[in-house]
Amino acid sequence: MEGPAEWGPEAALGPEAVLRFLAERGGRALHAELVQHFRGALGGEPEQRARARAHFKELVNAVATVRVDPADGAKYVHLKKRFCEGPSEPSGDPPRIQVTAEPEAPDGPAGPEARDRLPDAAAPESLPGQGRELGEGEPPAPAHWPPLSAGARRKNSRRDVQPLPRTPAPGPSEDLELPPHGCEEADRGSSLVGATAQRPARQNLRDLVMGSSPQLKRSVCPGGSSPGSSSGGGRGRGGGDSDSASVASSSAEEESSGGGSVTLDPLEHAWMLSASDGKWDSLEGLLTCEPGLLVKRDFITGFTCLHWAAKHGRQELLAMLVNFANKHQLPVNIDARTSGGYTALHLAAMHGHVEVVKLLVGAYDADVDIRDYSGKKASQYLSRSIAEEIKNLVGALDEGDGESAAGSGGGRWRLSKVLPSHLITYKLSHALEDGGDHHHHHHSAEGWVGGKAKDPGRKASGSSSGRIKPRLNKIRFRTQIVHTTPSFRDPEQPLEGRGEEGVGEERPVKGHSPFTLRPKSNVFG
């Protein structure tokens, strides 16, 4: 008959032949190797070859599945697990098919292929029907399929919809043969753990110094500055005297440059916390260990220990720091500036610490005329509730109180508001010659100093205290006003009145005057 002759080459093709071929290779073989092995049964005429190939594909799909290894893109034919479990396979090594994963590890050349069959037998909970009828071009289900590796046999069960739960549970023989991506994730995880372990210390310090004020975050290290400083100081000195020398030598450079290095050693870190806390108990141990910390500036705010003491209003601490500097012969600048240009007197005036202001000006002769980078003196930060003696002490008499004195003098205008830019003022260095005729004018001119009225009673009270620094040179000078056109006088005023005053040579301004008219006063004559 024509049928047996036509199907003669396909007679050798059967489930047993394919099953035997895969079982001999551990349940897994290259697709090209399988096709090459049965190529003799797939030849013949084109029509016969097409039927033989279709028949061969059906046989392979009946007993195995085709998968692509993502590592190299090679196609592998895997034996289905029901054929791996059954003991009725015609040939091959039965123990090799039925044993578990542990005894299969030391097998010979067929060991890697046999291990690839075991996930199907060891994972019965996975769906057996998935990927069963795969063709040659069917996409792979698992994420990783390294060839001939022990990790691949566990990955075969990743035909399930949820591949991730099986990844973190490797078997005892998978510790040295993890897939490449798994290794990268593990390394990345370990590096992240290592980075987070090193980060808190530096970030803690940065949070302490980068806030609005370091004392707001003292809760990170409350009361523990002294123990930390002793241990940190011991560690810094253990490395040599270079650390201590660098702290002292960098103070002068930081004073001029305005900041130091962001990285602090433990001793400097403890100093920052103790200085911002403003307690002598914690500062004493650090200053004894390293006296140069007394004049060291914070690299963010530019504060020294003196600035912190003035800010907190602790005059006892301020006196102790100055005495400590004198005892150790340290040059201390009581007028040292912060990063914003503030002196200790500025900070004490800002926060209303009157006793600190008295100590700085009276005992340590702080300069009351220094202005910060905003152009303000310390007296301009005093609140209105501060006593008048304290304002006179810091030089507020000539700055802000002239307005109130002028306001009590019958509604006079301040010269700075009256005089326009084209009126020139001259300072006379000689005394007034005709004191009799111009006595009244002389007296009124002395009452104005730099455009502000002086209070005679305030002068007497200030001189009794001995703390005022009056500007005597301004008192000696007189102010001469040169009238130029246009004039301040009302253009509608009759000429007779102006003639009586002796200033008839001035001509009225025609039209509307661009300057504000002022009331008459004895200052201008």
From Swiss-Prot:
Biased composition range(s): Low complexity: 101-112, 242-251
Renumbered ranges of ANK repeats: 301-330, 340-370
Keywords associated with the record: ANK repeat, Phosphoprotein, Repeat
Biased composition annotated in UniProt, kind: Basic residues: 468-477
SMART domains: ANK
Compositionally biased intervals (Basic and acidic residues): 489-509
Residues bearing PTM Phosphoserine: S88, S126, S213, S226
The UniProt record lists the keyword Repeat: yes
Skewed-composition ranges (Gly residues): 230-241
Region (Disordered): 84-263, 434-525
Top-level division of the source organism's lineage: Eukaryota
PROSITE patterns attached to this UniProt entry: ANK_REP_REGION, ANK_REPEAT
Family named by the database record: Belongs to the SOWAH family.
Protein's recorded name: Ankyrin repeat domain-containing protein SOWAHC
Organism whose genome encodes this protein: Homo sapiens
Name of encoding gene: SOWAHC
